[in-house]
Amino acid sequence: MTNFLPVTMQELLETGVSQPDFVYITGDAYVDHPSFGAAIITRLLQSQGYSVAVLAQPDWHTVKDFTRFGKPRLAFLVTGGNIDSMVAHYTSAKRKRSTDMYSPGGRAGLRPDRAVITYCRKIREAYPDAAIAIGGLEASLRRFAHYDYWDDTVRPSILADSGADLLMYGMGEHQITELAQLLAEGVPIQEITDIRGTCYLTSPENTPWGGVQCPDYAQVCRDKKAYAKATRQQYDQQDEITGKTVLQRHGDKMLVQNPPAVSLTQEELDAVYRLPYQRKPHPMYDAQGGVPGIEEVQFSIAHNRGCFGYCNFCSIALHQGRRITCRSEESILEEAKKITEMPNFKGYIHDVGGPTANFRLPSCKKQAKSGMCVGKKCLAPEPCKALQVDHSEYLHILRKLRKLPKVKRVFIRSGIRFDYVMADKDDTFFKELVAEHVSGQLKVAPEHVSNVVLDKMGKPHIECYEAFQKRFYEITKSLGKKQYLVPYLMSSHPGSTLQEAVKLSLFLRDNGMHPEQVQDFYPTPGTISTCMYYTELDPYTMEPVYVPKTPKEKAMQRALLQYYLPQNRQLVLSALKQAGRQDLIGTKPNCLVAPEQRSDSQRSHADKNRNSHTKGGVSPRKPKHSSKKSRRS
């Protein structure tokens, strides 16, 4: 027996159970840590007296693994894992990934494409009448008809595609608690239609009254304006106070999204984090080297949920929501003490964060009664006048953590919302952040420098980041430290023409930055930016949006972020010419790339081939700090 939930029939029998209440199927390896949704849901059910068996990464080629525990008494629960299975498998260029951080040994290929659909179909093959509920990120973000980047088409709701009975969206503690109770009372899953934070399919004549009717699946497939309209309608109803039921017809069925679940209270969130997690992968993976995904979170603490930053390319607003829920100081310190007792703890708490590390308060006072503003952002392009800005509680917690026995340092590695820092008139937190909580590098996310692109991203304008950067280095210098900002930057986001991409190159040049890794925009399911990518429309204004889509242009935009690399030279030359920025081609200090040079043999054949050139060029200007120190991990 281990202290993990049973993963074999023998382990289940050793608990005195022959038929589990639930079989939980996940596309990830089994890691019993609160950063993994599977751990939270299974431990929560266990705490409520239910028996749960875990089926992690089953072999989907036959039904054998799906019958390992027999048919559960109440339901199968299915998730694709911590991230969408297609994102786990493919890069933004649609190339197959060679590793999977959520699989044993980092091995790729242990989950199928579209894992939720595949797993549900295998369950139906084995047990046609079994109750199936789906949840997690893959199900949550695909709950409506959605553009699928990998198929380059609009797919129906994953609820219709998978054949499951119920879909739980968002953070699922309330939903699974209510569902388990109703199932235990003998209510058939097909009759469970009133749980907040769930979706179900019904006949059109049984559609609940008063819902917001989106354009149907057939409409959004053929009409991009209808798709954009549906996206806005769906986003506008995601607040737990103001959100209404959302309807979208799929053929002869009506998809019904009930209003969002109510956020956990602080007491409820604390209780979730008190569950008896082992904080590590199941020992069955030890021989394969464990599960790499645990490394980033093993000595980290999540202190909040939700994000009112509301970036258009981010899925958090549609999954966790815009409301901030925070754990108590006592809960955070309790987890930190557990971390310090782990045998491989070296004295360093790696991160104290969440979707956004430095949010502890609601964005404003009105939202408790009136809900979040519809169609508006709290921080972009400028902070709302009603925004509450206060880092004092977060700072107090960090100070308490630093004083714990065995703790040498407490870091905040990422997730700092720099515009929120700059909105704070008291810079005590900023100074202490730089003095105590930066491990040489602080990762922040300006994402771009063009305000045209930043507006499409839903991010603050670049002037805010520049002010933050200036102040960061002033404080760093005053402390006698050598610390650096590592900016996350994104190429090819909707709105980014080649001209806007060149502006990003010039920013990197002027700041002496040589990013070793860059990120192309990835059109993941359900986001506003993905809607822009597919429709070439802004769903909030219905105005056209320029979208770089061809592999050539996306490669050029990516190359401009690493213009100094010899292998990018030809792409950079092409990009600058197409952008009308030949002034940046040359050997002067302000140029990005040297002009094409002809060899002696090529000169003799110039009339025959005017375009022949070598791959020569000048070395990039020495950066203000080395690329090693600016490595993005």
Ranges and model annotations:
Residues 1-19, 29, 225, 229-300:
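N-terminal [4Fe-4S]-dependent radical SAM core
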Residues 11, 37, 56-250, 258:
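Glycine-rich beta-alpha loop elements in corrinoid/cobalamin-binding modules
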Residues 24, 59-60, 338-486, 490-494:
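Conserved SAM/AdoMet-binding glycine-rich loop
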Residues 61, 190-239, 252, 261-264, ...:
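Terminal amphipathic helices with adjacent charged low-complexity linkers/tails
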Residues 165, 272, 307, 332, ...:
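Conserved, mostly hydrophobic/aromatic
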